[in-house]
């Protein structure tokens, strides 16, 4: 999909499938919505890049998605989860919170990053 829109995709996965605390359903909700939002945000950006990282860090499962975006098109909102993508990010937040996790949204200049951190049930 990224190739279709001329977006450079950088991925890093540093874990085994046994280290993913989410169900397949919830993982699909999180990654699907974050990736869909990233592609949408990159549509009108030249040399767009999407970075996706999945890894375990200090007994947490971390999902990190960063993408280029046109900062001048940012809509103001009191709630970052309502920013541009509405239900998609709400669904991400709801899925992550089911596992006692949380999301950090960090829009800066021309990069938009979402980090989801979910505690692991056991020490790895």
Predicted regions and their residues:
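Conserved ATP-binding N-box helix of the HATPase_c
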Residues: 24-46
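Detector for a conserved hydrophobic position within an alpha-helical segment of the HATPase_c
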Residues: 96-97
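Glycine-rich nucleotide-binding loop
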Residues: 71, 108-115
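Conserved short strand/loop->alpha-helix "switch" segment adjacent to the catalytic nucleotide/phosphoryl-transfer site
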Residues: 11-30
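Glycine-rich ATP-binding loops of the HATPase_c
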Residues: 100-110
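Short conserved segments within the C-terminal catalytic ATPase subdomain
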Residues: 2-10
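Glycine-rich/acidic phosphate-handling loop/turn and adjacent ATP-lid/helix
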Residues: 59-90
